[in-house]
UniProtKB/Swiss-Prot annotation:
Designated gene of the protein: rplD
Classification via PANTHER family: 50S RIBOSOMAL PROTEIN L4, LARGE RIBOSOMAL SUBUNIT PROTEIN UL4M
GO cellular component: ribonucleoprotein complex; ribosome
Protein name stated in the entry: Large ribosomal subunit protein uL4
GO function terms (MF aspect): rRNA binding; structural constituent of ribosome
Alphabetic keyword roster: Ribonucleoprotein, Ribosomal protein, RNA-binding, rRNA-binding
Length: 215
């Protein structure tokens, strides 16, 4: 059974916690479907080209049908002319969103967590809170403290997951390129797959792994 690594306040390993048994044997195809759903939902349908009906001009026949030695033409909006309409061009009426049901979303999230745990890249800490130093009635050195926390993990990049994240913690990590801090309500399988390691607050971890199959 896969286990998440439990870290102490100094981010040193002090134990482990098992993932629920239902996380085992989940088909990886659920994660593939969720990633396609996530990326397609984020796609902006802005590409647009004009067809021959939308191009301006072309109200009269450019030259006589016969006698000129040239191929017949009825309008300069034809796709064969420079400046004419585009054949089979992009339209902004296509919906790229791919639907996925609630169960598949849950299975994708559970599979992604299981993968991180098997790779020893899933960590649990008691609290993720950056307070900084108060100077002149202002909180300073927030990013410095957040970077020290990230460096102590010795990971390539890290996703931090909090429960009821405060504004100082969010600000502290916002300037770090290889880190992202989110509230547990924003957690999804795509983010879990995108980052090489995940650090979760204990409360956030318990919130995620509780059985939601009967909800």
């Amino acid at each position: 059974m896969s286990k998440a690594i439990v870290l102490d306040s100094h981010l040193k390993e002090k134990g482990s916690v098992e993932l629920p048994k239902r996380y085992e044997g989940i088909n990886s195809h659920n994660l593939y479907l969720y990633v396609k759903h996530y990326l397609s939902s984020a796609r902006a349908n802005t590409a647009k080209s004009k067809n021959r009906a939308e191009v301006s001009g072309g109200g009269r026949k450019p030259w006589a049908q016969k006698g000129g030695g040239r191929a017949r033409a009825g309008s300069i909006t034809s796709p064969v002319f420079v400046g004419g309409g585009v054949s089979h061009g992009a339209t902004n009426k296509r919906n790229y969103n791919l639907k996925i049901n609630k169960k598949q979303k849950r299975l994708a999230l559970e599979y992604a967590l299981e993968e991180k745990a098997q790779a020893n890249k899933l960590f649990v800490v008691e609290k993720i809170a950056i307070k900084g130093v108060v100077e002149d009635n202002k909180r300073k050195h927030l990013t410095k403290e957040a970077n020290q926390m990230f460096q102590a993990l010795e990971q390539r990049d890290t996703l931090f997951v909090c429960l009821n994240m405060d504004e100082y913690t969010e600000l502290a990590f916002s300037n770090l390129k290889k880190c992202l801090v989110i509230d547990v309500s924003e957690l999804n399988a795509y983010l879990l797959a995108a980052f090489s390691s995940v650090v979760m607050e204990e409360a956030a971890f318990q919130h995620v792994v509780q059985d939601k199959t009967e909800e």
